[in-house]
């Protein structure tokens, strides 16, 4: 059996929307590009055709990936998110003692991680270190830039 893909409800909706978009809009666009490229004649030296076929392969691969992820999805119910300790689906406010600043992270499954928006995977160094910890605890985490110290200030949904 495949490993479950842990998602928040929001993450599930985003993946479903992406899948729908790829199946309805992008498939049709690429099919049209292939049709137009075929009209140019000789396919052996037709870069437009090759490009469209590569795009089609990428889209079909992404569709297959999304379908597999959704098939194995385990959605975290907001009511199941514990607030007494850090768990997947919660938002954690920490004080970064190394850089002397407050930072908020939302702990999510790796499928919906988006570090640029402070959504970090439960498998990332910081996410892994925060899991199971409580407000008031301080942790040291080894990250690519070195070791950072984080004090947990707040846990919420």
From Swiss-Prot:
SUPFAM superfamilies: FKBP-like, GreA transcript cleavage protein, N-terminal domain. It holds the Pfam family GreA_GreB. Residues 12-74 form a coiled coil. GO terms for biological process: DNA-templated transcription elongation; regulation of DNA-templated transcription elongation. Keywords: Coiled coil, DNA-binding, Transcription, Transcription regulation. Necessary for efficient RNA polymerase transcription elongation past template-encoded arresting sites. The arresting sites in DNA have the property of trapping a certain fraction of elongating RNA polymerases that pass through, resulting in locked ternary complexes. Cleavage of the nascent transcript by cleavage factors such as GreA or GreB allows the resumption of elongation from the new 3'terminus. GreA releases sequences of 2 to 3 nucleotides. This is Transcription elongation factor GreA. It comes from Caldanaerobacter subterraneus subsp. tengcongensis (strain DSM 15242 / JCM 11007 / NBRC 100824 / MB4). The gene is greA.
């Amino acid at each position: 059996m495949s490993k479950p893909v842990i998602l928040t409800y929001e993450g599930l909706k985003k993946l479903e929307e992406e899948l729908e978009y790829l199946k309805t809009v992008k498939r049709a666009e690429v099919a049209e590009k292939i049709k137009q490229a075929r009209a140019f004649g000789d396919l052996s030296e037709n870069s437009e055709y090759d490009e469209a076929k590569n795009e089609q392969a990428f889209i079909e691969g992404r569709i297959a990936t999304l379908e597999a992820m959704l098939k194995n999805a385990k959605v975290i119910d907001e009511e199941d998110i514990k607030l007494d300790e850090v768990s997947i689906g919660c938002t954690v406010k920490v004080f970064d003692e190394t850089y002397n600043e407050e930072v908020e992270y939302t702990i999510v499954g790796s499928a919906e991680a988006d570090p640029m928006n402070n959504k970090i995977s439960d498998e990332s160094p910081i996410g892994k270190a925060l899991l199971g910890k409580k407000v008031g605890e301080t942790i040291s985490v080894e990250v690519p830039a070195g070791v950072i110290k984080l004090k947990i200030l707040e846990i919420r949904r």
